[in-house]
Structures are given as C-alpha cells and as structure tokens.
C-alpha cells in the first residue's frame, strides 16, 4: 500500500500532528518517511549608488534545521527509516517536488498552516497539495 510517505514540518503544533500520523502509518506499514521543511530565502540589498540588487542567502536558518531535527528524532526513536530535506521556496511546491523525486505514495500535511497576508499571497498549503499532488494526500485535522 504506502511504502514511501512525505510529511511537511515547520515546527508548529499542526505540523507535529502530521509527523505523528506519518510515524503511526510508517510503523504499521513499514514505510520510509521523507520529512520536508521549506524556507523562503532572505533578500538582502547589496551594492549602492545607482545599482542596488537583491542577493539571495542560501542558508535555511536555525528554525528549519531545528524543525527537521525534532521530527527526524521523533521517528528515529521508533526505529523508522527517515530522510530529511530542507528546500528553498514555497512549502506546497517543496512537498510535491520531494514526493515526485522519491516516488512517494502519500503526502501528509496538517490542516492549518500560514495565516494572514502570507496565506493570501501564497495560498493554503493543504489546499494546493490536495489539488496538485502527484500521489494520495492525507490532511490531518487538528483541534481549533
């Protein structure tokens, strides 16, 4: 059935529930788990005078790293096969790209994500994935 599961994390309580569900399914089915965290690159002004340009910083930062480390630790304690990915860009795109790369059978996400202006500009991660994923999708419902 499901042998390769992709799950997204950003360190939020909603993402933690998604990781827990991925662990539960992976344990039951003997599946490998691919943990993905996405980050937006920081834009920094470089230069001066007439020609200012933006330069992208490649480092994902400690927030993404710690989110991934916590999720990986949670799964490895259970003896699960885990691989992690920190990807630059939109969270939904990052999850779907990893799912394609590893031929995933399932993507798991929480039902809540970005809020406010960021959600308005980029859209809901669960919504985008549910409409465009290359595989089955499980949206974990959280309280609230």
Task: Give the location of each predicted region.
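Small/aliphatic-rich secondary-structure junction motif
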Residues: 3-53, 74, 78
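Conserved beta-strand positions in the Rossmann-like core of class I SAM-dependent methyltransferases
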Residues: 34, 83, 138
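Short secondary-structure boundary segments
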Residues: 37-38, 110-112, 141-142
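Short, hinge-like loop/turn segments at secondary-structure boundaries
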Residues: 50-54, 101-103, 125-126
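A short acidic, glycine-rich active-site loop
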Residues: 52-66
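Structural beta-alpha unit
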Residues: 73-107, 144
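Glycine-rich, Arg-bearing micro-motifs that act as flexible, cationic patches
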Residues: 109-131
């Amino acid at each position: 059935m499901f042998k390769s599961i992709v799950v997204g994390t950003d360190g939020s309580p909603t993402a933690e529930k998604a990781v827990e569900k991925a662990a539960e399914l992976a344990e039951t089915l003997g599946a490998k788990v691919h943990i993905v965290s996405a980050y937006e690159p920081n834009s920094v002004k470089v230069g001066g005078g007439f020609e200012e340009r933006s330069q992208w910083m490649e480092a994902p930062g400690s927030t993404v790293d710690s989110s991934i480390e916590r999720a990986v630790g949670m799964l490895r304690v259970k003896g699960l096969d885990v691989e992690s990915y920190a990807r630059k860009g939109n969270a939904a795109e990052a999850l779907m790209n990893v799912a394609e790369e590893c031929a995933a059978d399932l993507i798991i996400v929480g039902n809540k994500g970005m809020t406010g202006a960021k959600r308005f500009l980029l859209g809901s991660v669960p919504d985008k994935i549910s409409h465009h994923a290359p595989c089955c999708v499980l949206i974990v419902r959280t309280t609230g």
